[in-house]
Design a protein with these regions (language model features):
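Rossmann-like dinucleotide-binding cores of NAD(P)H-dependent redox enzymes
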Residues: 47, 51-82, 86, 139-141, ...
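N-terminal Rossmann-like FAD-binding beta1-loop-alpha1 element of flavoenzymes
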Residues: 20-46, 161-170
Length: 468
């Protein structure tokens, strides 16, 4: 926030221009992240975006009350201003093709089209007017915050998109009900999102599902059934079985289907790319390269729907692969980095934290439900200064003091130091608390000599000395 609102924004170092051109199809989280790292490497980057604004699902799928668009737009603007060229309103197959990009002299192409097509509800009559997907509904509201879904709305599904659609619908003044075929505990949405929807007045009808939709005189009639939980499937999840004679009808203005998302098969066909068994682009998972060509893919079109931070990470990964390709280097996955951990809290010897005081964690403050349900103001208000300070003080400061940028992990990875091969006994440590001002923790000592200088200069005592 400080950087966004300052006059001098952070600007990364941009390498000397290489003369190489990279086309990126899609300006969502993954595509924008890849563009950032490619422009920093000195390559010319052009993004082809289907919508009129960049940001992808962050722009059109995450509601304003969760992600204020003015913040998102500022961050995107900073990336674009690094020298990235972006063209809006471009549709794959209609305006651009792989062959066309090759003719224009692009040295590499990155496909980052996301997974924005809605999965079918598989309900009779779901194609009638008034039935809309969760993705399309959220996009319409993002473009027109005064969009009117009518007085009564049903949302079908139990994931985060269903919750977002329901919480958005209720902000537009609609009496909103979620229909979910399983129990509340089995809803795939984040628990805190379900709680928030409850607070805002969204009704949740569990063990209920639509089976038929008809339209009469501008109203939608939905025939629903009650479900009961059956046997567990191979994944351990209980199946849902229709209860005989449990049919009931609802009359609504809009039905929002939000049971999942998938990759556009039309786009995949236009690129002549082979999809995998789940309809996603078949690319090397760790590099994003498709075969041995100059074509790459990243983000949700490769992995399926997920969280934005994962898509951004894959965008960076793809950019690194493209940079290697353009430099004539072998495109291969980054070696798995060495990770060392002391384990979970219950696995750590008690002497490491017996003297540490337990302090409460602060939850982010929120607008009260009655103050937010009629508007799109940001719900989470962030920490107050005192809360932020006390949260920061929860850090145990257990890191290495030798250097800010520790190279030990990189060196262990480079030399392939295997903890199994170099296994030894677990080292135990002692604590010396005999002095009133100084506590010596041998597990933290890196022989830097700071304690000696501190005791001599500040405390004017030589209780600690350094011996070579």
């Amino acid at each position: 926030d400080y950087d966004l609102n300052s006059d001098e924004h952070f600007k990364p170092e941009i390498a000397k221009k290489t003369g190489k051109k990279v086309a990126i199809i899609g300006g969502g989280p993954s595509g924008l992240t890849a563009a950032y790292f490619l422009i920093c490497a000195g390559h010319n980057v052009k993004i082809f975006e289907a919508n009129q604004k960049a940001g992808g699902y962050l722009q059109y799928g995450i509601p304003q009350y969760r992600l204020p668009k003015e913040v998102l737009d500022k961050e995107i603007e900073q990336i674009i201003n690094l020298g990235i060229n972006i063209e809006y309103g471009v549709k794959v197959g209609r305006d651009i093709s792989l062959a066309g990009l090759k003719k224009e002299g692009y040295d590499a192409t990155l496909v980052a089209i996301g997974a924005q097509d809605a999965a079918s509800m598989r309900v009779e009559g779901e194609d009638v007017e008034g039935v809309i997907s969760g993705v399309e509904f959220l996009e319409k509201v993002a473009m027109n915050p005064k969009y009117d879904p009518g007085k009564k709305v049903i949302v079908v599904g139990g994931g985060n998109t269903a919750i977002d659609a329901a919480r958005t619908s209720i902000r537009l003044g609609a009496d909103t009900t979620i229909l979910y075929r399983r129990s509340k505990q089995e809803m795939p949405a984040e628990h805190f999102e379900v709680v928030a929807a409850d607070k805002e007045g969204v009704k949740i009808e569990i063990l209920s599902a639509p089976v038929k939709i008809t339209s009469e005189d501008g109203k939608l009639k939905v025939q629903c059934v009650k479900m009961e939980q059956g046997a567990c499937d191979s994944s351990g999840r209980r199946s849902s079985v229709i209860i005989e004679g449990s049919k009931f009808d609802l009359e609504v203005d809009t039905i929002i289907g939000a049971i999942g998302q998938k990759v556009s098969q039309e786009c995949i066909k236009c690129f002549d790319i082979e999809p995998n068994d789940w309809g996603m682009i078949k690319a090397q998972e760790e590099t994003g390269q498709i075969g041995q060509s100059n074509l790459f893919a990243c983000g949700e079109c490769v992995t399926g729907p997920g969280i934005a931070s994962r898509a951004m990470g894959l965008g960076k990964q793809a950019a690194i692969s493209i940079i290697k390709y353009l430099n004539g280097e072998e495109v291969k996955a980054k070696e798995k980095q060495f990770i060392a951990t002391m384990g979970d809290l219950e696995e750590i010897p008690e002497e490491f934290y017996t003297d540490i005081k337990h302090a409460k964690r602060y939850s982010l403050s929120e607008l009260y439900a009655h103050k937010r349900v009629n508007n799109f103001l940001e719900v989470e208000q962030g920490y107050k200064y005192k809360e932020a300070k006390e949260e920061a003080e929860l850090c145990l400061e257990c890191g290495c003091l030798k250097a800010d940028n520790c190279l030990l992990r990189d060196l262990i990875t480079e030399y392939k130091a295997d903890p199994e091969r170099l296994k030894g006994e677990t080292k135990t440590y002692y604590f010396d608390k005999s002095h009133k001002d100084i506590v010596f923790e041998s597990n933290k000592c890196i022989l830097c000599g700071r304690c000696v200088r501190y005791s001599n200069e500040v405390k004017n005592t030589d209780v600690i000395t350094g011996v070579r």
